[in-house]
Amino acid sequence: MDFQVVIFILCYLIGSIPFGFILSYVIGIGDIRKTGSGNIGATNVFRKNKKLALLTLLLDALKSFICVAIAQKYNIDNTILFLAALFAIIGHMFPVYLFFKGGKGVAPLLGSLIFIDYRVAVCFLTFWIICFLLCKYASLSSIVSTLIALLFICTCYTIVQSVIFTITALLIITQHTDNIIRMLNKSENKINLKL
């Protein structure tokens, strides 16, 4: 088996680690999939425990950061970093450990961007915060910041890397389909940041 394939499989398996699910059980919340949107990401955890959501966000970002770091250690081609990030994010969205029902990939995207290009990560986070302060929708903020990151990647990186990131961005946006429908119907819940 090609060693790069082994790296991608490893990235998928690391990306599949459901920190939101695990942490929720550890502190006694129970199955986070039975709450709110039903996914295991930080936004849904936030509905039950705001401080735990921050830890979930950090760990979900860290796992993709680690995946990209592993890919760089064994391959100097930056394109492999984008593929490693993609597989980690796919693992987060469709975790093998939870019957392929996971999160939406936003935190792992941030983690991978921090490693690949911190400038894009800063833009991503900045636009997420600005959009959130204006609308209070985590989903819309995630979509907008993902598109901003896509614009930067397509401007500054190779065609192949841009295509890989476009696929990543489309997957993340597709994961927000239900949120988009609710926003159009004016039934999407806003997030209250008060602790």
Curated annotation (Swiss-Prot):
**Known Pfam families for this protein?**
G3P_acyltransf
Family the UniProt entry places it in: Belongs to the PlsY family.
Family matches, as InterPro entries: G3P_acylTferase_PlsY
Q: In which pathway does it act?
A: Lipid metabolism; phospholipid metabolism
Q: What is this protein called?
A: Glycerol-3-phosphate acyltransferase
Keywords on this record?
Cell inner membrane, Cell membrane, Lipid biosynthesis, Lipid metabolism, Membrane, Phospholipid biosynthesis, Phospholipid metabolism, Transferase, Transmembrane, Transmembrane helix
UniProt subunit comment: Probably interacts with PlsX.
Organism, as annotated: Ehrlichia ruminantium (strain Welgevonden)
Reaction(s) catalysed by this chain, per the record, are: an acyl phosphate + sn-glycerol 3-phosphate = a 1-acyl-sn-glycero-3-phosphate + phosphate
- Residues passing through the membrane, by range: 7-27, 52-72, 80-100, 113-133, 147-167
Q: What does this protein do?
A: Catalyzes the transfer of an acyl group from acyl-phosphate (acyl-PO(4)) to glycerol-3-phosphate (G3P) to form lysophosphatidic acid (LPA). This enzyme utilizes acyl-phosphate as fatty acyl donor, but not acyl-CoA or acyl-ACP.
Q: What Gene Ontology terms for biological process does this UniProt record contain?
A: phospholipid biosynthetic process
Main location as per UniProt: membrane
Top enzyme class = transferase
Its GO CC terms are:
plasma membrane
As recorded in UniProt, its EC number(s) are 2.3.1.275
Report the locations given in the UniProt record.
Cell inner membrane
Question: What Gene Ontology molecular-function terms does this entry list?
Answer: acyl-phosphate glycerol-3-phosphate acyltransferase activity
UniProt topology in membrane: Multi-pass membrane protein
